[in-house]
C-alpha cells in the first residue's frame, strides 16, 4: 500500500485521468473530492461491497 501525506487543497493523481483532492479535515473526518471520467465508478468501500453482494445474489438465482 502506498501511503501519502497531503494537506488541504493538495491533490494526488491516479493514472492520467483521476484526481483526488483533500477538501478539508475536521476532527477524525477527511473530506475528499474525486474527479474521474464517467466510465470510472467511484464508490465508498461500504457501498461498493453492497453492490458486489447484490450482484452475487442476483447471479445465484
From Swiss-Prot:
Location(s), subcellular: Cytoplasm
Gene Ontology cellular-component annotations: cytosol
UniProt keyword annotations, A-Z: Activator, Cytoplasm, Repressor, RNA-binding, Translation regulation
Entry keyword Ion transport: no
GO biological process: mRNA catabolic process; negative regulation of translational initiation; positive regulation of translational initiation; regulation of carbohydrate metabolic process
The organism's place on the tree of life at top rank: Bacteria
Signal peptide coordinates: none
Molecular function (Gene Ontology), one example: mRNA 5'-UTR binding
InterPro entries according to UniProt: CsrA, CsrA_sf
NCBIfam families: csrA, PRK01712.1
Similarity-based family: Belongs to the CsrA/RsmA family.
The protein's assembly and partners: Homodimer; the beta-strands of each monomer intercalate to form a hydrophobic core, while the alpha-helices form wings that extend away from the core.
General function of this protein: A key translational regulator that binds mRNA to regulate translation initiation and/or mRNA stability. Mediates global changes in gene expression, shifting from rapid growth to stress survival by linking envelope stress, the stringent response and the catabolite repression systems. Usually binds in the 5'-UTR; binding at or near the Shine-Dalgarno sequence prevents ribosome-binding, repressing translation, binding elsewhere in the 5'-UTR can activate translation and/or stabilize the mRNA. Its function is antagonized by small RNA(s).
Annotated PANTHER family: CARBON STORAGE REGULATOR
Protein name: Translational regulator CsrA
GN (gene name): csrA
Amino acid at each position: 500500500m502506498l501511503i501519502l501525506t497531503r494537506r488541504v487543497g493538495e491533490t494526488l493523481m491516479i493514472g492520467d485521468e483521476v484526481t483526488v483532492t483533500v477538501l478539508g479535515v475536521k476532527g477524525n473526518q477527511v473530506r475528499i473530492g474525486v474527479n474521474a471520467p464517467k466510465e470510472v465508478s467511484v464508490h465508498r468501500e461500504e457501498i461498493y461491497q453492497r453492490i458486489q453482494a447484490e450482484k452475487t445474489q442476483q447471479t445465484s438465482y
